[in-house]
Amino acid sequence: MKHRLNYLLVGCVLVLAVACFLSVSRPLTFERQRAEREKVVMERLHIIGQAQETYCRQHGHYAESLDTLVRNGLLADSLQFVPYSDHERFSLRTTVEITPSGRSLPQMECGAHYRQYLHGLDEAAIGSLTEKAEQTGDYPGVKVGGF
């Protein structure tokens, strides 16, 4: 009876040790995967930003859609989709601001939300990141440009 109780206690200790290890390793794994994915997404956003700059120099304003960049041969078709997402496109917003001196100032913002490029990872961690960004007034993901 005494040996059986000792085995049971050892089993409980092992289960608690594994649970403790997982509680520490899960957030670390998420952060590592997030950093890897953000690097890939930022590289793609940089390419889109360069294509937009080229389009703006040619036309005087930014392209209103990624399809326009693809049709003009400035962007490969596959680059308009967010990596790791379920074939979702980057969000794109453009505008032309008129300065007080009357000069036109084209602006654009292209980005991907956390839920897009962190698809398939810990949903609670993604929700926490999104909530934190929204509370601080930041973009809930990564982007280039802005208004």
What function would you assign to each model-found segment?
Residues E53-F147:
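Low-complexity, acidic interaction segments enriched in glycine
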Residues E38-H59:
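N-terminal alpha-helical signal peptides/signal-anchor transmembrane segments
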Residues V18-V40:
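Amphipathic alpha-helical segments typified by the pilin-like N-terminal helix
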Residues M1-L5:
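Short, Lys/Arg-rich N-terminal segment immediately upstream of the first membrane anchor
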Residues N6-V24:
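Hydrophobic membrane-insertion alpha-helices, especially the h-region
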